[in-house]
Amino acid sequence: MSDLLIHRHGRVLQLTLNRPQARNALNKALLTQIAEALEVAATDDSVGVCVISGNPRFFAAGADLNEMAEKDLPATLDDIRPRLWTRIDAFTKPLIASVNGYALGAGCELALLCDLIVAGDNARFGLPEITLGIMPGAGGTQRLIRSVGKALASRMVLSGESIDARQAQQAGLVSDIHPAALTDEYALKLAATIARHSPLALRAAKQSLRLSQEVSLQAGLQQERQLFSLLSATEDRREGIDAFLQKRTPEFKGR
């Protein structure tokens, strides 16, 4: 059976990590499958949103330590995994993590890379790499501090301690918490709601939101206005306004 299960739910694509014997550890093969699936979804106009999920006990417990144990310095410098993470990060449509159980190390970094995290009440997030004599290497230090702030990010990275779903929500890492048995259901429901909107507007909004973490406020405002102006020339913008005035549901075409 594949390490990545792929299911369609209307305009929502669900990618389910499927290495239960390895606690969904993210090895190169699984990262490659995720990157390839997202690249296909990016060019498929019938896909509006992607959801990445795990199993009831583990979203993903980290990188595959069996692979890492074989890496010396030259092999680490030539590792393909940074390129795989870059490919995953390049996905331009909304990406939601549906997290039950443990999201640790690379698993936490995968969740951080998503636009939204929907968590089960049994979820735990952590970056325990420091306990192995290493540090996060797939965006953990950079994305976590932008999500939860310096104090909590520093505590998690330097101590290796994890936080539960409620702490993650209070810190701004998690958007929603649900009973673990219903996490995927609610994540897919949220994804379906988002997928109803204009694909062009969703991509532009995601681009602007992500840019806000990298540039000054003034530069971000300028980019936001440029994207807003470009959307004003689209058929979807006219359809959205017409539908609102006519009190009907819009039918967006991505044009």
Where are each of the predicted segments found?
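Conserved CoA-thioester-binding segment of acyl-CoA-metabolizing enzymes
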Residues: 1-55, 86, 233
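Terminal peptide-recognition signature
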Residues: 15, 19, 34, 52, ...
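Charged catalytic carboxylate motif
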Residues: 29, 33, 80, 87, ...
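Glycine- (often His-adjacent) and acidic-residue-rich active-site loop
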Residues: 32, 54-87, 103, 133, ...
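Crotonase-fold acyl-CoA enzyme core
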Residues: 89-202, 229-234, 239-242, 248, ...
